[in-house]
């Protein structure tokens, strides 16, 4: 009985503690600092000195005709750097501005209550100004500035960048429906946000939004097929079906022109967008959940949208399908889980239900430190907050070294880091980009969730209910590419430079920062333990709902790749590779992996805790050096989202270089060679030279007893 009484007292204390923390939380201060993070990521000629340690940067960024702005700087010099790097990726930047615009529209009164209206609108405008500048002609848009591989191979503040920064354009011949529609969405949302305070600017935003919508809708194509440099960082995993709907919804909201809504309704049905939302995150790649939510409000007479949104939200609630950490974070994937939970929390706040509001409250509480470890995931705020996020400017190395100085020189206050592992484990380690990268899209959903909690009893702005014609007034010019129901989200945003330290993600030199920002089902992720200084920024790993393609054979071996991925393993690589190469195939196989080592890229095949090294003692694979051989590569084992052991392939081959035009079997012991035990998440094979090497081929990757 005494034990029972103590348990009851502990439960009551826990509930009271939560209530007190909620009551005492200054959401206005959190919101202000979350917005100030964007000032820390500004590029171009800065209009103020609000962040004294940031200066002018990327002043020569321009469209291919070297156009200048009013200050004589490149016309694309402004905008936001994506994450902890110096690249301007058009898709996540536009997505971030759409999300900020959306939260402003929904929670304008809460924002005003905090006295943050001016800061909020300034934050949006700094991004939308760049989107307008990037829209250089009716059917032309600058989708990216900066070479991700080159940028990620250097570690230092953006003010010191000297590398070439190419601009990648989208045109009618090189279309990019995702970016065109996302930029249209951002500018349409901005036109609503600025309508009362700056009607002239609002009109400019809307004019560009209409033209961009027409560009994306008429000239269809996957943007990362046109801007191939983006594939290792922000590949379009979901295709553009969701973007067609998303863009049309926002144009309808801004114009009340029913033609846009008719398109949205038709494309939602034909593209299977409701299905794309289920079991997934709302993020820069997949806007399907947001489409369900907005259409449920715009077309309340059609139950499909409400049903689809409720299905999505229920998945995120306890017991609904998404993994929950022991401390209570809704954890959908290992790359930057905090960002997904924060964005889901924002959408939950708009559900108009008690369970949605409760979900929002609990997720934000966890992120700001109300969790068993009393660990905040917001830099500079809450208990035990991070101080070493993966961010070049805040770290401020002058020696191209991710480890020097030991601690970041400047506090990136208000930035949401990637977040914990599935068991709430977390280490404040700059080189661990999976847990410690920050990015504009990470904060975008977080800002919205915070704005909702300033006054949780406030309701979002109601939307007009239109009359919808079920048949589109314009038939799509092309059937959008197919989208998986599960979409990876991102790939690295950065690549290490050269001096490795430990778990680089992309280009060694130091320790990588983060190769993808997320780990896609197909590209991104992490980087070596040795050279890289950083890896890509956003590789997203897809929601783990894949059906295994092969069952391991009675404990003797576990196939990872055999003419294709096996047993739930996914492609989280960053770098130039193919999983379906047929030009150099081992006898008895139909495909091999081709990999062109350069810029510290890697082939990363992962599956969370799928290899139990107590059962499978070794990792084996066959490798062919192709036309030249002698490639300098390293194999790294990943556990709990971190590299835990690494060996040069040459060393595993008895000191013999990789042989040209011949298949060689490589075998390594998890315990003896990598000093690792327990369950691990996979392996990556990475370039350690930096310069481009000849293509290598890999086959038959298995874990053996």
Swiss-Prot record:
Glycosylation sites: 75
Recorded catalytic activity of this chain's protein: Endohydrolysis of (1->4)-beta-D-glucosidic linkages in cellulose, lichenin and cereal beta-D-glucans
Enzyme Commission number(s): 3.2.1.4
GO cellular component, one term: extracellular region
Annotated signal sequence range: 1-23
Pfam families referenced in this protein's UniProt entry, alphabetically: Glyco_hydro_9
InterPro entries reported for this sequence: 6-hairpin_glycosidase_sf (IPR008928), 6hp_glycosidase-like_sf (IPR012341), Glyco_hydro_9 (IPR001701), Glyco_hydro_9_Asp/Glu_AS (IPR033126), Glyco_hydro_9_His_AS (IPR018221)
UniProt keyword terms in alphabetical order: Carbohydrate metabolism, Cellulose degradation, Glycoprotein, Glycosidase, Hydrolase, Polysaccharide degradation, Repeat, Signal, Sporulation
Residue segments, region Disordered: 455-556
Disulfide bond entries: none
Keyword Glycoprotein belongs to the record: yes
GO molecular function annotations of the record: cellulase activity; cellulose binding
PANTHER family: ENDO-1,4-BETA-GLUCANASE
Protein family per UniProt: Belongs to the glycosyl hydrolase 9 (cellulase E) family.
Identification of the protein by name: Endoglucanase
Biological classification of the source: Eukaryota, Amoebozoa, Evosea, Eumycetozoa, Dictyostelia
Encoding gene per record: celA
């Amino acid at each position: 009985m005494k034990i029972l009484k103590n348990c009851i007292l502990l439960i009551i204390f826990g509930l009271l503690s939560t209530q007190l923390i909620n009551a005492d939380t200054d959401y206005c201060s959190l919101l202000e600092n979350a917005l100030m993070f964007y000032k820390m990521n500004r590029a171009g000629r800065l209009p103020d000195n609000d962040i004294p340690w940031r200066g002018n940067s990327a002043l020569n960024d321009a469209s291919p005709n070297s156009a200048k702005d009013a200050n004589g700087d490149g016309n694309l010099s402004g905008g936001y750097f994506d994450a902890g790097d110096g690249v301007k990726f058009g898709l996540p930047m536009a997505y971030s501005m759409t999300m900020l615009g959306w939260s402003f529209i929904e929670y304008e009164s809460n924002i005003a209550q905090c006295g943050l209206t001016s800061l909020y609108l300034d934050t949006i405008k700094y991004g939308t100004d760049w989107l307008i500048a990037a829209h250089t002609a009716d059917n032309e848009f600058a989708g990216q500035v900066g070479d991700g591989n080159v940028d990620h191979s250097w570690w230092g503040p953006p003010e010191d960048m000297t590398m070439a920064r190419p601009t990648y354009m989208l045109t009618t011949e090189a279309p990019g429906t995702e970016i065109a529609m996302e930029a249209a969405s951002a500018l349409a949302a901005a036109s609503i946000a600025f309508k009362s305070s700056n009607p002239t600017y609002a009109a400019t935003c809307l004019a560009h939004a209409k033209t961009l919508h027409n560009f994306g809708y008429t000239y269809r194509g996957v943007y990362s097929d046109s801007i191939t440099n983006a594939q290792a960082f922000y590949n379009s995993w979901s295709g553009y079906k969701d973007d067609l709907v998303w863009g049309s919804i926002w144009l309808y909201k801004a114009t009340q022109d029913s033609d846009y809504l008719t398109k949205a309704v038709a494309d939602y049905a034909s593209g299977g967008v409701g299905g794309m939302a289920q079991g997934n995150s709302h993020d820069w790649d997949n806007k399907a959940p947001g489409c369900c939510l907005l259409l449920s409000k715009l077309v309340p007479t059609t139950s499909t949208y409400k049903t689809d949104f409720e299905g999505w939200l229920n998945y995120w609630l306890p017991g609904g399908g998404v993994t929950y950490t022991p401390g209570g974070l809704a954890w959908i994937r290992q790359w930057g889980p905090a960002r997904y939970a924060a964005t889901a929390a924002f959408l939950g706040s708009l559900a108009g239900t008690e369970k949605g509001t409760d979900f929002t409250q609990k997720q934000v509480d966890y992120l700001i430190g109300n969790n068993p470890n009393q660990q905040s995931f917001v830099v500079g705020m809450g208990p035990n907050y991070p101080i070493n996020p993966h961010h070049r400017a805040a770290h401020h190395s002058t020696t191209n070294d991710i480890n020097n100085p030991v601690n970041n020189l400047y506090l990136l206050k208000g930035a949401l880091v990637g977040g914990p592992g599935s068991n709430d484990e977390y280490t404040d380690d700059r080189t661990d980009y999976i847990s410690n990268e920050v990015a504009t899209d990470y904060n975008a959903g977080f800002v919205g969730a915070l704005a909702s909690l300033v006054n949780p009893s406030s309701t979002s702005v109601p939307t007009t209910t239109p009359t919808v014609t079920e048949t589109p007034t314009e038939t799509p010019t092309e059937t959008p590419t197919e989208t998986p129901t599960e979409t990876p989200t991102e790939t690295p945003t950065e690549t290490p430079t050269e001096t490795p330290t430990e778990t680089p993600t992309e280009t060694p030199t130091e320790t990588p920062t983060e190769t993808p920002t997320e780990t896609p089902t197909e590209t991104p992720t992490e980087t070596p333990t040795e050279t890289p200084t950083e890896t890509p920024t956003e590789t997203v790993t897809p929601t783990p709902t894949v059906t295994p393609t092969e069952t391991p054979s009675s404990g003797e071996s576990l196939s990872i790749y055999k003419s294709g991925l096996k047993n739930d393993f996914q492609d989280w690589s960053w770098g130039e590779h193919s999983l379906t190469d047929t030009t150099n195939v081992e006898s008895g196989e139909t495909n091999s992996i081709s990999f062109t080592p350069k810029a510290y890229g890697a082939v990363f095949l992962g599956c969370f805790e799928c290899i139990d090294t107590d059962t499978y003692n070794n990792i084996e694979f066959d490798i062919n050096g192709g036309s030249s051989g002698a490639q300098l590569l390293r194999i790294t084992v990943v556990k709990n989202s971190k590299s835990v052991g690494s060996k040069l392939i040459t060393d595993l081959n008895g000191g013999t270089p990789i042989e040209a035009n011949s298949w060689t079997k490589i075998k390594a012991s998890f315990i003896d060679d990598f000093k690792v035990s327990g369950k691990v998440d996979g392996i990556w094979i990475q370039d350690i030279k930096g310069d481009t090497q000849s293509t290598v081929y890999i086959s038959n990757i298995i874990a053996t007893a």
